[in-house]
Amino acid sequence: MAHPSQLGFQDAASPVMEELLHFHDHALMIVLLISTLVLYIIVAMVSTKLTNMYILDSQEIEIVWTVLPAVILILIALPSLRILYLMDEINDPHLTIKAMGHQWYWSYEYTDYEDLGFDSYMVPTQDLVPGQFRLLETDHRMVVPVESPIRVLVSAEDVLHSWAVPSLGVKMDAVPGRLNQTAFIASRPGVFYGQCSEICGANHSFMPIVVEAVPLEHFEKWSTMMLEDA
């Protein structure tokens, strides 16, 4: 999760997020090389005493500054498109969860079960216990099994919201009257935090998201307990 004075991304907890981090490093290196080249040319043009007032055109330079940007754009676009298709692909999900945004909390419904659903509210600061995080804890976590494809159907009951968990590399808009979907695979057990990422009113910053990834046997025990309590 995020920590004070953090400069980089959160640790990846899904294959898609790992791909996004690799693409970020790839694009950053290209931007760094371009910036270095442009800075060198600017310094060279300003500092040199050599000038030629009679050059009207240069076929070689025009070819270079046309072909080189095209190659750079291709080097950025191809891996970007690959990740885009990976994020959009949902093959044989083992579990489907419907996340519904409200002002200002989330509700979850496990559609593969007959009666498994709950509301998830932020834990007030005065009710926190040692080890919990202010503005990030919820009274009910969305529990999922690790190493399993999870599909999340996202919508909203009132206004625009956005369901986002950075460590899992997922962010999907919740639009009233529209059912969007996203998917992820939690590659390791853990607790992953997110927040509503679309301004939705006065308490927009007080509707956190908590995803807890557990081994399959623990998930089965949790789901059985939730069904018994329903």
Curated annotation (Swiss-Prot):
Signal peptide from the UniProt entry: none
Sorted UniProt keywords: Copper, Electron transport, Magnesium, Membrane, Metal-binding, Mitochondrion, Mitochondrion inner membrane, Respiratory chain, Translocase, Transmembrane, Transmembrane helix, Transport
Binding site for Mg(2+): E198
Claim: Ribonucleoprotein is one of the keywords in the record: no
Catalytic activity: 4 Fe(II)-[cytochrome c] + O2 + 8 H(+)(in) = 4 Fe(III)-[cytochrome c] + 2 H2O + 4 H(+)(out)
EC number(s) stated in the UniProt entry for this protein: 7.1.1.9
Subcellular compartments: Mitochondrion inner membrane
Transmembrane parts of this sequence: 15-45, 60-87
Regions of this protein lying in the Mitochondrial matrix compartment: 46-59
Stored CDD domains: CcO_II_C
Gene Ontology cellular component annotations, sorted alphabetically: mitochondrial inner membrane; respiratory chain complex IV
Topological domains annotated Mitochondrial intermembrane: 1-14, 88-230
Keyword flag Membrane: yes
Protein's membrane topology: Multi-pass membrane protein
Molecular function terms, GO-annotated: copper ion binding; cytochrome-c oxidase activity
Cofactor: Cu cation
Cofactor note: Binds a dinuclear copper A center per subunit.
Coiled-coil regions listed in the entry: none
GO biological process: ATP synthesis coupled electron transport
Assembly mode: Component of the cytochrome c oxidase (complex IV, CIV), a multisubunit enzyme composed of 14 subunits. The complex is composed of a catalytic core of 3 subunits MT-CO1, MT-CO2 and MT-CO3, encoded in the mitochondrial DNA, and 11 supernumerary subunits COX4I, COX5A, COX5B, COX6A, COX6B, COX6C, COX7A, COX7B, COX7C, COX8 and NDUFA4, which are encoded in the nuclear genome.
UniProt xrefs under PANTHER family: CYTOCHROME C OXIDASE SUBUNIT 2, CYTOCHROME C OXIDASE, SUBUNIT II
Function according to Swiss-Prot or TrEMBL: Component of the cytochrome c oxidase, the last enzyme in the mitochondrial electron transport chain which drives oxidative phosphorylation. The respiratory chain contains 3 multisubunit complexes succinate dehydrogenase (complex II, CII), ubiquinol-cytochrome c oxidoreductase (cytochrome b-c1 complex, complex III, CIII) and cytochrome c oxidase (complex IV, CIV), that cooperate to transfer electrons derived from NADH and succinate to molecular oxygen, creating an electrochemical gradient over the inner membrane that drives transmembrane transport and the ATP synthase.
Name used for this protein in its record: Cytochrome c oxidase subunit 2
Taxonomic source organism: Oncorhynchus mykiss (Rainbow trout)
